[in-house]
Amino acid sequence: MLGEVNRLISSRGLDAMTTAAVVAYYREENVAKVSYAGHPPVLYRRAAEKAWSFAKPQGRKGLNNGPPMNIPLSVEPDTPYGQLTIPMTIGDQLFVYTDGIIDAPSPGGEPFGLARLKDALDANEGASLSDLKSAVLETLNHYTEKELSHDDVTLIALEIC
């Protein structure tokens, strides 16, 4: 799907790019399938575990080492986008977010980053999805010492039922 969207956007001749993540859950197979186009990695937490893990996309491998993956949309018209498969069971959770979260700067200019995001999620084990999102935003606002306004900030938290 991302390949087709990429070709469509690229054909418009716009001097712009964007990121995207597609997450689909297949109940019959008990898996989530994730594809990235320049997007930060989804986090997942198994119901039986306390810590969150990154569903890491493959980086750009180069011309002779296979197809590029996780390239933003509209950068290369014929980019083949890969897909990660995450086995899921009841109670497992997924956390999808935009780069506005990890790029949010401290007053000194240091980005919030992936490690702080994971730490914020890990620190709120057992929280409802709504409380989990609120805790991440509260941690982020405390880190930046202000309400976020520099970039888009979107959080999606899902639990397999």
PLM region spans:
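Conserved subregion of the PPM/PP2C metallophosphatase catalytic domain
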Residues: 1-161
